[in-house]
């Protein structure tokens, strides 16, 4: 049983992909703000932080926006027979209020718990063990602002984090979309890459 993204990793596509770049239209958004380099180890934290902070600002629902982080904290607590991880996430969430530096710092700490849920405790590294950088927090604010502008231009978000219950198969058992408007499914990518045929097939 695979997720959509795991299944795509096993698919051999033709040179330009099954859903080639030529089928897409591209728009450039320019805010004259330059992203700063961050260590590769922080790239996934940056992407998740932008995703979750954007969801929270749009919905106002902290528990839903940071659900995976909370599930990860619960996994940590289960293994260590404690409730400290969950308490820490909830404490950090109290200081997530919007598009500001304090929120960015706390969100980056919160998403560290995702790994415990997504990949297991073997790969989990607590916020206290993670070496954060100022560049990371700056980038999260810039990228979140860009995301909000993009989504506003696309149209009103009517739902987010949707799954496809009843639409999975014996081969693909999970997959979701980030945002839904009245006429568009949106899968948000926070990446320095230009285009990927894996993204388009997804």
Question: What residue spans do the PLM features occupy?
Answer:
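Charged, amphipathic alpha-helical stretches
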Residues: 2-54
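Short non-domain terminal segments
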Residues: 22-24, 130, 135, 162
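Hydrophobic, aromatic-lined core segments that form the binding pocket/scaffold
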Residues: 49, 53-155
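Active-site metal-binding core of divalent-cation-utilizing nuclease and nuclease-like domains
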Residues: 153-182
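Conserved catalytic cores of phosphodiester-cleaving nucleases, focusing on short active-site segments
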Residues: 178-194
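Active-site-adjacent loop/helix micro-motif of nuclease/hydrolase catalytic cores
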Residues: 193-201
């Amino acid at each position: 049983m695979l997720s959509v993204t795991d299944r795509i990793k096993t698919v051999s596509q033709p040179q330009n992909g099954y859903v080639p770049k030529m089928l897409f239209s591209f728009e450039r958004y320019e805010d004259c703000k330059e992203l700063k380099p961050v260590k590769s180890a922080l790239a996934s934290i940056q992407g998740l932080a932008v995703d979750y902070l954007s969801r929270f600002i749009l919905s106002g629902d902290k528990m839903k926006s940071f659900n995976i982080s909370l599930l990860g904290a619960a996994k940590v607590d289960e293994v260590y027979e404690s409730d400290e991880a969950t308490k820490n996430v909830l404490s950090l969430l109290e200081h997530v209020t919007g598009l500001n530096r304090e929120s960015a710092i706390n969100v980056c700490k919160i998403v560290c718990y995702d790994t415990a849920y997504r990949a297991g405790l073997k790969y989990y590294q607590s916020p206290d063990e993670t070496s954060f950088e100022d560049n990371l927090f700056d980038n999260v604010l810039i990228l979140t602002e860009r995301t909000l502008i993009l989504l506003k231009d696309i149209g009103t978000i009517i739902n987010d984090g949707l799954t496809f219950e009843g639409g999975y198969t014996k081969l693909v058992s999970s997959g979701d979309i980030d945002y839904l408007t009245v006429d568009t499914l949106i899968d948000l990518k926070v990446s320095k890459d230009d285009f990927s045929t894996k993204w388009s097939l997804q």
